[in-house]
């Protein structure tokens, strides 16, 4: 297939027959590069990063390290905030165990001991109840 450009018309000759095209905005595949790029455009532009592959790798690695650092910072902030809040599932079992130990140490006294305390008391049983700020 041979293509001839004559001003605004393009003529394609195929096996002795000719087809005329007058639309200047439509370009045929021969005017474009192998993968759809125009002749003026570099067909290898999408692969130019490989020219400086070490710089590209370093940049990507820095971005990954930065993202990892940010993730660790956020996790540390969340952990610190978690410690400041009361979470029953985490905090209650320890507190309940401590209270259970304290309750086990208590004993119920019999009524004779309370009578002994009252008989040894120096307080006046007929005195009025003390109320702070009230003068009698």
From Swiss-Prot:
Region Disordered, annotated ranges: 15-40, 107-136
Reported tissue expression: Expressed at very high levels in pancreas, at high levels in testis and at moderately high levels in brain, heart and lung (at protein level).
Q: Does Ubl conjugation count among this protein's keywords?
A: yes
Q: How is it modified after translation?
A: Ubiquitinated in vitro.
Q: Where is the composition biased (Basic and acidic residues)?
A: 27-40
Report biased composition (Polar residues) as residue ranges.
Answer: 15-25
Any Pfam family the entry gives = PAM2
Q: Give the Gene Ontology MF terms in alphabetical order.
A: mRNA regulatory element binding translation repressor activity; poly(A) binding
Q: Which UniProt keywords apply?
A: Repressor, Translation regulation, Ubl conjugation
Its GO biological process terms? negative regulation of translation; negative regulation of translational initiation
Give the matching InterPro entries: PAIP2-like, PAM2_motif
| Subunit relationships | Interacts (via central acidic portion and C-terminus) with PABPC1 (via the second and third RRM domains and the C-terminus).
What's this protein's function? Inhibits translation of capped and polyadenylated mRNAs by displacing PABPC1 from the poly(A) tail.
Q: Which family does it belong to?
A: Belongs to the PAIP2 family.
Name listed for the protein in its UniProt record: Polyadenylate-binding protein-interacting protein 2B
To which species is this protein native? Answer: Mus musculus
Query: What lineage does UniProt assign to this protein's organism?
Result: Eukaryota, Metazoa, Chordata, Craniata, Vertebrata
